[in-house]
């Protein structure tokens, strides 16, 4: 596996992983892979097909027959079975249910294998919750981004408003705290920093400051 070309960026919901990872990828001329979008796509399909989200077997089979394509561009597009669902995977319904789907071991096995295959094909910047610990454990550059729940809720609110959704900030804070608990306490691939990850608390930092910090660390590690 060409993990020496890969940068792993992990962290909780709303930590700014995707925005930061995109910019890092652009500056270093690497492919950006949003693994969270893949779990969101499976969740969206399950909701559309009215599959019981507590039926692990049904969801594993769903993941196996789901084709997810990530298209590079200024704003990465996500295709679900050939159809653009970039906006649909960011709905509150998907956001509130994706942790249920993501904690299923069989679903993770299917998607992790696909993520590793992507990393085999090209140097990548990959963000998620278990990239440095599970997906690309031998990646030379690993980062763990975090920020306060309030800061992350404000960022998520801005993202949702950009997609045209109404936002209740207090409710968002509550949902983020609940998701943190679920992600950190799940039996499979819990949200924890890799032992060799660089920890970055982005509270009060601009996106560009975080990006430059990561690039500085990457350049040092060459």
UniProtKB/Swiss-Prot annotation:
<feature type="binding site">
    <location>
        <begin position="11"/>
        <end position="19"/>
    </location>
    <ligand>
        <name>ATP</name>
    </ligand>
</feature>
<keyword id="KW-0963">Cytoplasm</keyword>
<dbReference type="GO" id="GO:0005524">
    <property type="term" value="F:ATP binding"/>
</dbReference>
<keyword id="KW-0547">Nucleotide-binding</keyword>
<keyword id="KW-0418">Kinase</keyword>
<dbReference type="GO" id="GO:0015949">
    <property type="term" value="P:nucleobase-containing small molecule interconversion"/>
</dbReference>
<protein>
    <recommendedName>
        <fullName>Cytidylate kinase</fullName>
        <ecNumber>2.7.4.25</ecNumber>
    </recommendedName>
</protein>
<dbReference type="GO" id="GO:0006220">
    <property type="term" value="P:pyrimidine nucleotide metabolic process"/>
</dbReference>
<dbReference type="InterPro" id="IPR003136">
    <property type="entry name" value="Cytidylate_kin"/>
</dbReference>
<dbReference type="Pfam" id="PF02224">
    <property type="entry name" value="Cytidylate_kin"/>
</dbReference>
<dbReference type="InterPro" id="IPR027417">
    <property type="entry name" value="P-loop_NTPase"/>
</dbReference>
<dbReference type="GO" id="GO:0005829">
    <property type="term" value="C:cytosol"/>
</dbReference>
<dbReference type="GO" id="GO:0036430">
    <property type="term" value="F:CMP kinase activity"/>
</dbReference>
<keyword id="KW-0067">ATP-binding</keyword>
<dbReference type="GO" id="GO:0036431">
    <property type="term" value="F:dCMP kinase activity"/>
</dbReference>
<dbReference type="InterPro" id="IPR011994">
    <property type="entry name" value="Cytidylate_kinase_dom"/>
</dbReference>
<keyword id="KW-0808">Transferase</keyword>
<comment type="similarity">
    <text>Belongs to the cytidylate kinase family. Type 1 subfamily.</text>
</comment>
């Amino acid at each position: 596996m060409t993990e020496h070309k890969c940068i792993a960026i992990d962290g909780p919901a709303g930590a700014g992983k995707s925005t930061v990872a995109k910019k890092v990828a652009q500056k270093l001329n690497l492919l950006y892979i949003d693994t969270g979008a893949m779990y969101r796509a499976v969740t969206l399909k399950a909701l559309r097909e009215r599959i019981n989200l507590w039926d692990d077997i049904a969801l594993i089979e769903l993941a196996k027959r789901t084709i997810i394509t990530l298209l590079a561009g200024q704003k990465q597009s996500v295709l679900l079975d050939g159809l653009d669902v970039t906006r649909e995977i960011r709905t509150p319904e998907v956001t509130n249910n994706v942790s249920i789907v993501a904690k299923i071991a069989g679903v993770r096995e299917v998607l992790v294998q696909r993520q590793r295959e992507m990393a085999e094909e090209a140097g990548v910047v990959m963000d998620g919750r278990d990239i440095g610990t599970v997906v690309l454990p031998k990646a030379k550059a690993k980062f763990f981004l975090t920020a306060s729940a309030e800061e992350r809720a404000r960022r998520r609110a801005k993202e949702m408003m950009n997609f045209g959704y109404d936002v209740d900030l207090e409710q968002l804070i509550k949902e983020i705290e609940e998701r943190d608990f679920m992600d950190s306490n799940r039996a499979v691939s819990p949200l924890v920093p890799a032992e060799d990850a660089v920890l970055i608390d982005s509270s009060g930092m601009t996106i560009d400051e975080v990006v430059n910090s990561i690039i500085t660390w990457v350049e040092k590690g060459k």
